[in-house]
Amino acid sequence: MRPSGRQPDQLRPVTLTRKFTRHAEGSVLVCFGDTQVLCTASVLPKVPPHKKGSGEGWVTAEYGMLPRSTHTRSDREAARGKQSGRTQEIQRLIGRAMRTVFDLRALGEHTLHLDCDVLQADGGTRTASITGAFVAAYDAVSVMREKGQLVGDPVRDFVAAVSVGVVDGVPVLDLDYPEDSACDTDMNVVMTGSGGFVEVQGTAEGTPFSRAEMDAMLGLADQGIRTLISLQKQALGL
């Protein structure tokens, strides 16, 4: 039995609360159990230098954790004067995941800027960020459509993410913090609604994992992401 009482193939309770803040074109509070992330999507009338004059837009992301989102307070990265390698890795992952399912040409020369701020961390903050950021981006695109800012429909597919791992020799879905800190293997999987893999990040924590365990973890991730995409569609009224 897992510490949370869940079955190996069971997600934590997941909620996606849209229009959580007032000013951003898209905003979502995403909760995976006790992990809470505020995802906002802003539409900017400009693109990075490498996209200027191309007729294409851009999708990018920033990620951060509030000082007391974890058990002990950590300094703000702004106070330290630089982002950690972990932060940079996660925000690049979020941006890559979004660009996989957006047609940049249909955005015109606009940037969708996603901000993912962790309010409370209990494992899986990067996967929750991706899952919530897509819904925020979808809402931002709807605002662009209403304003006549789009060249076409930029949303090509849905995208979501989940963590999987091996804990005490058992492959499990959606690790919380106690499991994440004690697991034999930790893997983050990003997939599209059509079943394509966007990213697979897997690391053994001391004990190598077998091909059978990897296949089992990917199977759990596929199942979990299908459920998450259904929840995204439900939240969007689709």
Curated annotation (Swiss-Prot):
InterPro entries noted in UniProt: ExoRNase_PH_dom1 (IPR001247), ExoRNase_PH_dom2 (IPR015847), ExoRNase_PH_dom2_sf (IPR036345), PNPase/RNase_PH_dom_sf (IPR027408), Ribosomal_Su5_D2-typ_SF (IPR020568), RNase_PH (IPR050080), RNase_PH_bac-type (IPR002381), RNase_PH_CS (IPR018336)
Nucleotide-binding recorded as keyword: no
Any one Gene Ontology BP term: tRNA processing
Catalytic activity: tRNA(n+1) + phosphate = tRNA(n) + a ribonucleoside 5'-diphosphate
Root EC class: transferase
MF terms (GO), sorted A to Z: 3'-5'-RNA exonuclease activity; tRNA binding; tRNA nucleotidyltransferase activity
Pfam families reported in the protein's UniProt record: RNase_PH, RNase_PH_C
Protein residues bound to phosphate: R86, G124, T125, R126
Keyword terms, alphabetized: Nucleotidyltransferase, RNA-binding, rRNA processing, Transferase, tRNA processing, tRNA-binding
Superkingdom per UniProt: Bacteria
Enzyme Commission number, as recorded: 2.7.7.56
Region: Disordered, residue numbers: 66-88
Family: Belongs to the RNase PH family.
Quaternary structure note: Homohexameric ring arranged as a trimer of dimers.
Role of this protein: Phosphorolytic 3'-5' exoribonuclease that plays an important role in tRNA 3'-end maturation. Removes nucleotide residues following the 3'-CCA terminus of tRNAs; can also add nucleotides to the ends of RNA molecules by using nucleoside diphosphates as substrates, but this may not be physiologically important. Probably plays a role in initiation of 16S rRNA degradation (leading to ribosome degradation) during starvation.
Protein's recorded name: Ribonuclease PH
